[in-house]
Amino acid sequence: MTSNLLSLYRFAEQQDIDVDWVSMTRATSLSVPLPDGRYAIAIDPWKMDSLTMETVCLAHELGHCETGSFYNQYAVCDIRKKHENRADKWAIRRLIPRDQYETALADGCTELSDLANRFGVTPEFMEKAVCLYTYGNLAIESYRPILG
């Protein structure tokens, strides 16, 4: 789990993406494009419950940067959701590659909590990954009764 987090910080550094720890009133984490074409990420460490939460937040924000999926406060809900989904999909593919996910299933690791522990992510994030790899989308609310 710690190795995932450290590799994400290294990746950000290699991509010249600033990652700063900042106390924020509302957000837990956020990413922004900078005028010079680079990106910056802010993470509020006081809102992180665990290293897995920090890992998921950083991967998600890197997903925004790597896919260029940004929006402003005036964007309509469907545009926001589209950009959030792109960031989540990037993060899922980075933290839980499909081949490793399939190997975990073949090994008998099928419970969400066990999968989350195996990949060092939060159960909520793992639920999104299962939904993406099973149904091809992130509409977890549509499949929650099935995913259990």
What do the PLM-derived regions correspond to, one by one?
Residues M1-G148:
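Active-site hotspot residues in diverse enzymes, especially metal/ion-binding acidic/histidine motifs
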